[in-house]
Design a protein with these regions (language model features):
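Extracytosolic ligand-binding ectodomains
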Residues: 1-151
């Protein structure tokens, strides 16, 4: 990094998966992701603590995507009282689910079948033992333009 110029790019460049290898070289990077471990909510604290206990490392954006996908599916199945034989009913149930997970609120966009979610702008800063991701701004309820999947 350069003291006079910040480096920016895709958030996964400094994902929690890569920070242990990058160490202090990542400090100063600015990026955006749908999840950073420093989100200050009870849902994220519980998720992060449990993940760290079970896997010995800080969760990444990929870990939270799997967790939230499972949460959406569970809620959709519950809403159908476990009867998931009709795929169109299950799809409709998923489209009607709104959950709050470690990364914040999310729903499925009926037009694109993509997730409507917060995006976090962050900077990598020096942490106690490892660099961490400090949230600079939150862009709420980001929606895909609708040019994607047409399931």
């Amino acid at each position: 990094m350069n003291k006079n110029m910040k480096i920016t790019g895709a958030g996964w460049t400094t994902s929690p998966l890569f920070i242990p290898a990058q160490k202090d070289a990542a400090i100063g990077f600015i990026g955006s992701l749908n999840y950073v471990p420093s989100i200050d909510t009870n849902e994220n604290k519980m998720f992060k603590d449990s993940y760290l206990k079970n896997f010995g490392r800080v969760p990444s954006e990929f870990a939270v995507q799997g967790y939230d996908a499972g949460k959406v599916i569970i809620e959709a199945v519950k809403s159908l009282s476990g009867n998931i034989t009709d795929k169109s009913q299950l799809t409709e149930a998923i489209n009607n689910i709104s959950v709050v997970g470690p990364r914040g609120p999310l729903t499925i966009d009926r037009n694109s079948n993509n997730v409507i979610q917060n995006i976090y702008i962050f900077e990598v800063i020096k942490g106690d033992t490892m660099p961490s991701l400090k949230i600079l701004d939150t862009i709420e309820a980001v929606k895909d333009p609708g040019t994607g999947c047409s399931l």
